[in-house]
């Protein structure tokens, strides 16, 4: 046990940054509502940073903050703020002004190449080959997600496509996050806190006992979540 009541350690987190290109709160609110509707499992109640570097018109910050918060997003900071008055308004509300890392210069465009002949379309897949620990959230937009290691309780996997877990699955798995009801979840050891396909979900105590801790395949059949052995 540590001899001190607290300990400070460096860490890093993956956060979504919302770049504001419009100073009208109502316009921002509607745009965010539309975006959240596309991937509610990933964006609903998500922590975000607001980047205001592209705003040229004066901003009613109180109204803007309320408009963003009304969507369910949780504003944890603001970046890209160069206006002293706006900084003061933001800090008065208790939000930190964050400094982003320097943007890298764009790489030169590659030389044009002749199109390949007889190529076969390849489905994009996000591959994670390290353990997914508690508190981590991994999202695979517009593609499948494959995890070749264990997923701890408190971790969250989200994919617009299918989810494959080739290890112990103790966290939450949400496939078809953008609404695709044809997606599936494949686990070699199903011990999940929650499984969801296109919004249809089971909590851990709803997973049939005969499949708990076993290799399983989940999919929607007639709009209901089902599970069968993974052969």
From Swiss-Prot:
One of its GO terms (biological process) is division septum assembly. Residues 102-125 are annotated as: Disordered. Keywords: Cell cycle, Cell division, Septation. InterPro entries: CAP/MinC_C, MinC, MinC_C_sf, MinC_N, Septum_form_inhib_MinC_C. It comes from the Bacteria. Signal peptide: none annotated. Belongs to the MinC family. Interacts with MinD and FtsZ. Cell division inhibitor that blocks the formation of polar Z ring septums. Rapidly oscillates between the poles of the cell to destabilize FtsZ filaments that have formed before they mature into polar Z rings. Prevents FtsZ polymerization. This is Probable septum site-determining protein MinC. It comes from Escherichia coli O1:K1 / APEC.
């Amino acid at each position: 046990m540590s001899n001190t009541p607290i300990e400070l350690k460096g860490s890093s987190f993956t956060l979504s940054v919302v770049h504001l290109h419009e100073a009208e709160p109502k316009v921002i609110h509607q745009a965010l509502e539309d975006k959240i509707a596309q991937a509610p499992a990933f964006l609903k109640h998500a922590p975000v940073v607001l980047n205001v570097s592209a705003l040229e018109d004066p901003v009613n910050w109180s109204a803007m903050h309320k408009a963003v918060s009304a969507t369910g997003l949780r504003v944890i900071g603001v970046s890209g703020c160069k206006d002293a008055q706006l900084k003061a308004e933001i800090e008065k509300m208790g939000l930190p002004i964050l400094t982003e890392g320097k943007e890298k210069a764009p790489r030169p465009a590659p030389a044009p190449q002749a199109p390949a002949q007889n190529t076969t379309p390849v489905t994009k897949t996000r591959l994670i080959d390290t353990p997914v620990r508690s508190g981590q959230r991994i999202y695979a937009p517009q593609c499948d997600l494959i995890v070749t290691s264990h997923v701890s309780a408190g971790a969250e996997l989200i994919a617009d496509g299918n989810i494959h877990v080739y290890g112990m699955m103790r966290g939450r798995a949400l496939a078809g996050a953008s609404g695709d009801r044809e997606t599936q979840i494949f686990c070699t050891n199903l011990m999940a806190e929650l499984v969801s396909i296109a919004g249809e979900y089971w909590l851990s105590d709803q997973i049939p006992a005969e499949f708990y801790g076993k290799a399983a395949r989940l999919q929607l059949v007639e709009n209901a979540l089902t599970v069968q052995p993974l052969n």
